[in-house]
UniProtKB/Swiss-Prot annotation:
It comes from Euphorbia characias. The modification N-acetylproline is found at residue 3. It catalyses: 2 (2R)-3-phosphoglycerate + 2 H(+) = D-ribulose 1,5-bisphosphate + CO2 + H2O; D-ribulose 1,5-bisphosphate + O2 = 2-phosphoglycolate + (2R)-3-phosphoglycerate + 2 H(+). The gene is rbcL. This is Ribulose bisphosphate carboxylase large chain. It is found in: Plastid, Chloroplast. The basic functional RuBisCO is composed of a large chain homodimer in a 'head-to-tail' conformation. In form I RuBisCO this homodimer is arranged in a barrel-like tetramer with the small subunits forming a tetrameric 'cap' on each end of the 'barrel'.
Length: 58
């Protein structure tokens, strides 16, 4: 039988939903020659902000 280990939930990852435009959206980002462009057409469900629907694809 393998020994039991204690897991701490607060180490390395904190669960929860963050507002996409507050954490990942960077409108002033300037593209580089090494960037790859991918395009998706996303239609958010009623009541879902476009940024949040786009974050689901990202």
């Amino acid at each position: 039988m393998s020994p039991q280990t204690e897991t701490k939930a607060s180490v390395g990852f904190k669960a929860g939903v963050k507002d996409y435009k507050l954490t990942y959206y960077t409108p002033e980002y300037e593209t580089k020659d090494t960037d790859i462009l991918a395009a998706f057409r996303v239609t958010p469900q009623p009541g879902v902000p476009p940024e949040e629907a786009g974050a689901a694809v990202a």
